[in-house]
Amino acid sequence: MSSSDPKPGPKPGPWPPTPESAAMPPSSWAKKTGFRPKFSGETTATDSSSGQLSLPVRAKQQETQPDLEAGQTRLRPPPPVSAAVTNGETDKDKKEKPPPPPPGSVAVPVKDQPVKRRRDSDGVVGRSNGPDGANGSGDPVRRPGRIEETVEVLPQSMDDDLVARNLHMKYGLRDTPGLVPIGFYGLQHYLSMLGSLILVPLVIVPAMGGSHEEVANVVSTVLFVSGITTLLHTSFGSRLPLIQGPSFVFLAPALAIINSPEFQGLNGNNNFKHIMRELQGAIIIGSAFQAVLGYSGLMSLILRLVNPVVVAPTVAAVGLSFYSYGFPLVGKCLEIGVVQILLVIIFALYLRKISVLSHRIFLIYAVPLSLAITWAAAFLLTETGAYTYKGCDPNVPVSNVVSTHCRKYMTRMKYCRVDTSHALSSAPWFRFPYPLQWGVPLFNWKMAFVMCVVSVIASVDSVGSYHASSLLVASRPPTRGVVSRAIGLEGFTSVLAGLWGTGTGSTTLTENVHTIAVTKMGSRRVVELGACVLVIFSLVGKVGGFLASIPQVMVASLLCFMWAMFTALGLSNLRYSEAGSSRNIIIVGLSLFFSLSVPAYFQQYGISPNSNLSVPSYYQPYIVSSHGPFKSQYKGMNYVMNTLLSMSMVIAFIMAVILDNTVPGSKQERGVYVWSDSETATREPALAKDYELPFRVGRFFRWVKWVGI
């Protein structure tokens, strides 16, 4: 090199540190189940077994990152290498600097700079690409020497508001709107669930031979008990904004008990009271079993077997099992029933996006709007004489009609006219529902055993509703103890329903999840105010009389939609699992198929094609106890087995539980429910505020670990 050449400048320092990868949002399965794994790029590291937020810790960095959506494993980018020194460092700094490590793993410890502990994008401290440090040899490499940022935690109120905004909810679980919004949204919430509250008694009371006045009394009792049990559940149960009422889960066993052989020969005006007392006794025993299941902590063990793949076919089978009841009864008056079905479909589907003052009135009020329009049209047809035939009286029983001309039109007059019911005119203005109003309950062990099994199915249905609604309105899913506490309280409230004589148990209505998602209203106070209004309405006898006057054809038409909705809500639980997995598809398909095929075998066994049964065709699936294939020397056992195995929901539950818990599958594939744990409740005030008992009642039950937070 010549002397005229310029001297080379100082060598440039190492490359600047590469920016950390942007935080990846949780995968769809993680969002839907509340699962937060310790994978790279996710900002909230969790324990995969419990799904809870963990404190920032320094651990070894993983080399690969599982892809929850694609089920693949992809390589992590190499960790950043920070600058060792700057170009302007002094000789003193160079002397104090330790010798550099081998190429490819340069990292300089920083002693003079205070480094705050922070969580990496995956919550751990990494090492260079190799199992033992630098390409597989040497000691683990230190993190780059630069001033780290601390993890900022939002205040609790800001965190709650953020959750509510992310979920697009108008009001969260603990929000208290003004009095006017509470009243409006409370009325909206209960009107949207009108069908679920009143349709069950309109089915079972006529099946028991009850009069129009008795139908009105049972409807008022259902409103009263639903209001009381909802207040109890929002205060001492799960504390989620879930309405309690007569669940469709109890409808099939109630109809099976009503059509038992020992009740077929009853005559007189006391048929209704006698059958109701038998039904009350069975509900009380079955509900007491459910209460023991919850408060003893056994429900926490059952939760290990209950997953979305189990809940989906079980709940769906409840709605599908009533296919023989729906349209056969609608066919008694097609011009009224079909119009009712078409209107509710148009409102719920075709007009669902039409908003008035930011409220989707057609979607929210699909059932009451379609009922009001159809009822008004049927009233006009009745008043104009469309269903009036000369010399025929619709109030005369068919057995007393002599004229052949009138016999031909009696069915049409009975189901199409709207003035055949005198429930409204005969109902008193004030009536207080009281316990044991139908008499002392009668206890029969075989009917009680059937209800005990049904209470387990009702608990499974409620578990799915708890999880789905908590993801909408709460900061986290409840703990297993809270779920057990809620199931225990549902058993207690169903005992109250049995004492008051509603004909069914009082459990969480599955339609709650749909209503909360549509109305965007998750406030607990709204549901509580609506429950108080429901209790007040139940004391006005004319309200029960008005609801009891709904024609049977319209009831069947609404039930066609409600049972279809119930089936859809059950199948929607599959969104928490891998719905495209062949494992889950086969399990759900087998469960649904056999839930329809096996009961059909039991229901058709021993019935000749030419047999003339005394019960209507839509009640024939519930008389299987008298002719089922299970025959032994114990008549009570025959009744229990034939009745249970003729219920679709029981077969679906048995099939799904066995297959889901024996066929291998990952937690992600199965969509295992992720519940919060007690340790998280102590760290996060939001979780405790969401689920802790009011008035500091929980401090007296801290020793009961299995039913608390």
UniProtKB/Swiss-Prot annotation:
<feature type="transmembrane region" description="Helical">
    <location>
        <begin position="329"/>
        <end position="349"/>
    </location>
</feature>
<feature type="transmembrane region" description="Helical">
    <location>
        <begin position="438"/>
        <end position="458"/>
    </location>
</feature>
<dbReference type="GO" id="GO:0035344">
    <property type="term" value="P:hypoxanthine transport"/>
</dbReference>
<feature type="compositionally biased region" description="Basic and acidic residues">
    <location>
        <begin position="89"/>
        <end position="98"/>
    </location>
</feature>
<dbReference type="GO" id="GO:0015208">
    <property type="term" value="F:guanine transmembrane transporter activity"/>
</dbReference>
<feature type="transmembrane region" description="Helical">
    <location>
        <begin position="308"/>
        <end position="328"/>
    </location>
</feature>
<feature type="transmembrane region" description="Helical">
    <location>
        <begin position="361"/>
        <end position="381"/>
    </location>
</feature>
<feature type="transmembrane region" description="Helical">
    <location>
        <begin position="639"/>
        <end position="659"/>
    </location>
</feature>
<feature type="compositionally biased region" description="Basic and acidic residues">
    <location>
        <begin position="113"/>
        <end position="122"/>
    </location>
</feature>
<keyword id="KW-0812">Transmembrane</keyword>
<feature type="transmembrane region" description="Helical">
    <location>
        <begin position="551"/>
        <end position="571"/>
    </location>
</feature>
<comment type="similarity">
    <text>Belongs to the nucleobase:cation symporter-2 (NCS2) (TC 2.A.40) family.</text>
</comment>
<dbReference type="GO" id="GO:0015207">
    <property type="term" value="F:adenine transmembrane transporter activity"/>
</dbReference>
<dbReference type="GO" id="GO:0005886">
    <property type="term" value="C:plasma membrane"/>
</dbReference>
<dbReference type="GO" id="GO:0098710">
    <property type="term" value="P:guanine import across plasma membrane"/>
</dbReference>
<feature type="compositionally biased region" description="Polar residues">
    <location>
        <begin position="41"/>
        <end position="53"/>
    </location>
</feature>
<dbReference type="GO" id="GO:0015294">
    <property type="term" value="F:solute:monoatomic cation symporter activity"/>
</dbReference>
<feature type="transmembrane region" description="Helical">
    <location>
        <begin position="240"/>
        <end position="260"/>
    </location>
</feature>
<dbReference type="GO" id="GO:0098721">
    <property type="term" value="P:uracil import across plasma membrane"/>
</dbReference>
<keyword id="KW-0472">Membrane</keyword>
<feature type="compositionally biased region" description="Pro residues">
    <location>
        <begin position="7"/>
        <end position="19"/>
    </location>
</feature>
<protein>
    <recommendedName>
        <fullName>Nucleobase-ascorbate transporter 12</fullName>
    </recommendedName>
</protein>
<feature type="transmembrane region" description="Helical">
    <location>
        <begin position="190"/>
        <end position="210"/>
    </location>
</feature>
<feature type="modified residue" description="Phosphoserine">
    <location>
        <position position="40"/>
    </location>
</feature>
<keyword id="KW-1133">Transmembrane helix</keyword>
<feature type="transmembrane region" description="Helical">
    <location>
        <begin position="530"/>
        <end position="550"/>
    </location>
</feature>
<keyword id="KW-0597">Phosphoprotein</keyword>
<keyword id="KW-1003">Cell membrane</keyword>
<feature type="transmembrane region" description="Helical">
    <location>
        <begin position="585"/>
        <end position="605"/>
    </location>
</feature>
<feature type="transmembrane region" description="Helical">
    <location>
        <begin position="218"/>
        <end position="238"/>
    </location>
</feature>
<feature type="region of interest" description="Disordered">
    <location>
        <begin position="1"/>
        <end position="145"/>
    </location>
</feature>
<dbReference type="Pfam" id="PF00860">
    <property type="entry name" value="Xan_ur_permease"/>
</dbReference>
<dbReference type="InterPro" id="IPR006043">
    <property type="entry name" value="NCS2"/>
</dbReference>
<feature type="transmembrane region" description="Helical">
    <location>
        <begin position="283"/>
        <end position="303"/>
    </location>
</feature>
<keyword id="KW-0813">Transport</keyword>
<dbReference type="GO" id="GO:0015210">
    <property type="term" value="F:uracil transmembrane transporter activity"/>
</dbReference>
<dbReference type="GO" id="GO:0098702">
    <property type="term" value="P:adenine import across plasma membrane"/>
</dbReference>
